[in-house]
């Protein structure tokens, strides 16, 4: 399946967070994992995200087996979803670029506070997902991670870290994916969705960041909301499309998601798009009321 949006898809399904995938891992069902990889590739995924859960920390051979099996089944490159330098090193060692047409894998992910993963860049070449949701601050001589809540904080972190990757490590802009955290709107009284969209606009307009990608997972945005919008549409899916309708023109170009969801731009008069835009203008209890308008006309 292709998407009318000009975006790339990173297939998210090889992850034990999905019950059906957890069963494949629990049963060591290699053929089932391969079939899931093929399904995502055939649905248009440009990369496949791989996360085998906590077992990655204790069973490197099993992880290498999974990576090899996936690469035997598909030719799309892989994204390794682990915060551990040790695990990432094992993933990169197991990955065979030749089976992906020479394409580099993605390390998912680094932050300013977790920069040690870049020590692997001398031994291996890879693309990287850079989390813009947290920054590092010096507090009494100690480096402390702080969450970003404003557009300027998100943009400042993204710019600082992306330029560091390019200038200190020689990483091409095209190999950098800035992860823009897309939060659930159900309890977003602080304008976090609005801050994310405003930050996307700032990053997309910065000539120093030309060529850098912006991405995110969209599954959180509709969490804990009813299945249907007030107009009868699939609320969660339509919300995801509303977010993309607003952000793809600003430079958001990659989605970590389920490839067969079929993201489509919404027309300007679409009920959910208009209700989401209204929500973005609100804060506090007014934002909560605006969320209810999505499913109560």
Identify the residue ranges that each predicted region occupies.
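Acidic (Asp/Glu)-rich catalytic clusters
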Residues: 2, 41-42, 71-72, 92-100, ...
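Active-site mouth loops of central-metabolism enzymes
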Residues: 4-35, 59, 108-109, 139-153, ...
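Catalytic beta/alpha-barrel core
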Residues: 49-55, 76-84, 102-113, 132, ...
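Alpha-helix-loop-beta-strand connector modules within alpha/beta enzyme cores
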Residues: 58-102, 196-214
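Catalytic alpha/beta core domains of metabolic enzymes, predominantly
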Residues: 119-281, 286-290
């Amino acid at each position: 399946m292709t998407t009318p949006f000009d975006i790339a898809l990173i297939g998210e399904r090889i992850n034990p967070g999905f019950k059906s995938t957890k069963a494949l891992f629990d049963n060591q069902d290699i053929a089932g994992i391969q079939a899931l990889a093929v399904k995502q590739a055939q649905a248009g995924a440009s990369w496949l995200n791989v996360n085998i859960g906590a077992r990655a920390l204790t069973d490197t051979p099993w992880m290498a087996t999974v990576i090899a099996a996936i690469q035997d089944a598909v030719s799309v490159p892989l994204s390794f979803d682990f915060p551990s330098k040790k695990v990432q090193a094992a993933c990169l060692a197991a990955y065979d670029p030749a089976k992906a047409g020479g394409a580099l894998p993605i390390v998912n992910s680094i932050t300013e506070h977790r920069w040690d993963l870049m020590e692997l860049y001398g031994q291996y070449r890879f693309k990287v997902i850079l989390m813009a949701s947290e920054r590092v601050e010096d507090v009494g001589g100690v480096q402390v991670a702080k969450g970003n809540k404003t557009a300027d904080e998100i943009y400042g972190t993204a710019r600082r870290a992306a330029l560091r990757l390019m200038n200190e490590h020689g990483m091409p802009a095209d190999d950098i994916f800035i992860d823009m955290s897309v939060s659930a709107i159900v309890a977003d009284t602080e304008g976090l969705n609005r801050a994310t969209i405003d930050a996307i606009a700032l990053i997309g307009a910065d000539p120093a960041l030309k060529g850098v990608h912006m991405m995110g997972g969209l599954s959180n945005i509709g969490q804990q909301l009813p299945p249907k919008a007030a107009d009868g549409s699939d609320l969660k899916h339509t919300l995801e499309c509303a977010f993309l309708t607003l952000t793809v023109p600003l430079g958001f170009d990659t989605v970590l998601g389920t490839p067969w969801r079929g993201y489509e731009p919404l027309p300007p008069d679409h009920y959910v798009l208009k209700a989401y835009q209204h929500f973005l203008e609100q804060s506090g209890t007014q934002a909560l009321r605006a969320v209810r308008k999505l499913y109560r006309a």
